[in-house]
Amino acid sequence: MRKIISSKVSCDEELLELCERLSRMDIDCTIESKGNRVRVYVFGYDKDSLKXNYRTIREVMEKVKRKYQKDDEGLYKYPLFELKYPVNKNLIIDALKTLGYKVIYLEDENAIKTNVDINKFNEILGELHELSQELRFSNLGSKPVKNLVVLVSYITKKPVDDVIEEALEKGFFREEEGRIVLNKDINLAKKALLEGEDGDKDIGEER
């Protein structure tokens, strides 16, 4: 028994990810593509198995589609457990909002909806991850402090060491028992470090 699912893809990357995902699944199916059109043939040994296989593959196709194609709100959806680079959720949300993008966190799905396309999204993740790696052996005391340093470094393009030094000099951080910890309200520190002494850097205006 079989069913056919017809769909469209937006690019070769979407088709490739769909093929890779389906190939890893323990479900009897084949996929054909021509241009941007895709057909998936789903098989089952009885009605119940065919129905379950069909439903599972439809769900996978929809998840892949939402990463590459906007929904009716003009947003993409990225499950956080499928990120190309392992980056802290709060850091991602802060960075996107500071850049002026729309961001919605779906707690029940552990996913982010945003108007950033997947190529730009992965580019942002890659840079945040690279900066985070620079702090692996630092004496920064907590994840929020590390996130703040990475965010400010990413937005202002200052080296992470310069951000830490500036935060210490301005009293936003302090040294305590060999570790660098937060000394003032984190939102106040974020605003001041992002805007600089003149406070004239325009941040967070939604795109």
Swiss-Prot record:
InterPro entries: DUF2067. Pfam families: DUF2067 (PF09840). It comes from the Archaea. This is Uncharacterized protein MJ0388. It comes from Methanocaldococcus jannaschii (strain ATCC 43067 / DSM 2661 / JAL-1 / JCM 10045 / NBRC 100440).
